A protein has these predicted regions:
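Short-chain dehydrogenase/reductase
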Residues: 97, 145-156, 183-190, 211-212, ...
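Hydrophobic alpha-helix immediately C-terminal to the catalytic Tyr-X-X-X-Lys motif of short-chain
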Residues: 154, 158, 162, 192, ...
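Conserved active-site region of classical short-chain dehydrogenase/reductase
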Residues: 101-109, 186, 216-219, 223
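N-terminal Rossmann-like NAD(P)+-binding domain of SDR-like oxidoreductases, especially those catalyzing
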Residues: 1-174, 178
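A conserved pocket-lining segment of Rossmann-fold NAD(P)-dependent short-chain dehydrogenase/reductase
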Residues: 89, 139-141, 170-181, 191-213, ...
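C-terminal substrate-binding subdomain of Rossmann-fold SDR/epimerase-dehydratase oxidoreductases
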Residues: 196-306
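Conserved hydrophobic/aromatic "anchor" residues
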Residues: 11, 128, 176-179, 212-214, ...
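A glycine/serine/threonine-rich, flexible loop-to-helix segment
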Residues: 134, 185-193, 251
Length: 306
């Protein structure tokens, strides 16, 4: 199949592109190479994609989507392009309206125009707000804690509206704290490992619990959803809530660096924990990588870059 991925030089997008290419699909990605974090890391991922025979189209979804879509016959498009992260959304909420809501509407309109058979949208566990326990999909009720979460929740509702109005086939993934090699530098585990390897102190904000989900589990689930032509909303997580303080303490002890604690940041929820029964029953999703194993793979990747 011909598969398109927006945000394909991002962490999840590039990993998904490599997986689908390895499975025999013809993959093309579009990315604007924005500077939310180090652009060189995105360019590095893009070079790896190109070395593997994956087309990389540099362009902005708002302006260049027709050119990209018009030159392909995609059987499915994964829409991952967005501004990520809670802290940035507190500083520049209007950018998240533009790049997380309006951009999704642009993709939905294009999916109608170009008759894309199947669309998958990348959402976030942040849409659940401040809740405890293993969360089911119906428990997202709009009681969000940040502009980022509000943008993702709004984009989800646009997807559902277009599915109801126009019959678009849409699958929505709610990702839970995705981590792994070549990840996002603003994420806690990436930051902790970089600092620990450099002998720098680690800082934990609050006492958060996170359902850390390894990148390979995430992309495997996305491929399974593609194979099943799944529609609806699906949690993709590890089903294993872990203490961020414990993860930092383990790294601190291993690399002999101090761990400091600071107040929780505005907009962050205290816990994420996924119930993935819907994904398991619909397309066979079963996460398998433990946090300990995933962190070892990250440490190896970071060491190789020092």
């Amino acid at each position: 199949m011909q598969i398109g991925i927006t945000g394909g030089a991002g962490f999840i997008g590039s990993a998904l592109a490599l997986r689908l290419h390895a499975s025999g699909h013809t993959v093309s990605v579009i990315d604007a190479f924005t500077d939310y974090y180090d652009v060189e890391l995105k360019l590095e991922r893009a070079r790896l994609l190109q070395q593997n025979g994956i087309e990389v189209f540099e362009g902005n979804v708002h302006e260049d989507l027709p050119t990209w879509l018009g030159s392909h016959s995609f059987a499915a498009v994964f829409h991952l392009a967005a501004l990520p992260g809670v802290p940035g959304s507190l500083q520049e909420p209007h950018r998240y309206i533009e790049d997380d809501i309006a951009m999704t509407v642009t993709v939905l309109e294009a999916a109608r125009t170009y008759a894309i058979p199947h669309l998958f949208f990348a959402s976030s566990s942040s849409v659940y707000g401040e809740q405890t326990g293993a969360l089911l999909e119906h428990q997202a009720t709009g009681q969000v804690m940040s502009p980022y979460a509000a943008a993702k929740y709004s984009a989800e509702t646009f997807c559902q509206a277009y599915q109801n109005l126009y019959g678009l086939q849409i699958g929505i993934f709610r990702f839970f704290t995705v981590y792994g090699p070549a990840g996002r530098p603003d994420m806690a585990l990436y930051r902790f490992i970089e600092q620990a390897l450099r002998g720098q102190p680690l800082t934990v904000f609050g006492d958060p619990i996170r359902d850390f989900t390894y990148i390979d589990d995430i992309t495997r689930g996305m491929e399974q959803a593609l194979q099943a032509q799944a529609t609806g909303v699906f949690n993709l997580g590890a089903n294993r809530p872990e203490s961020v303080r414990d993860a930092a303490a383990m790294l601190g002890e291993r690399f002999d660096v101090p761990v400091a604690f600071a107040p929780a940041r505005a907009g962050d929820v205290s816990m994420t924990w996924s119930n993935t029964d819907a994904a398991r029953k619909t397309f066979g999703y079963v996460p398998s990588v433990t946090l300990a194993d995933g962190m070892e793979r990250m440490i190896t990747w970071h060491r190789d870059r020092l």
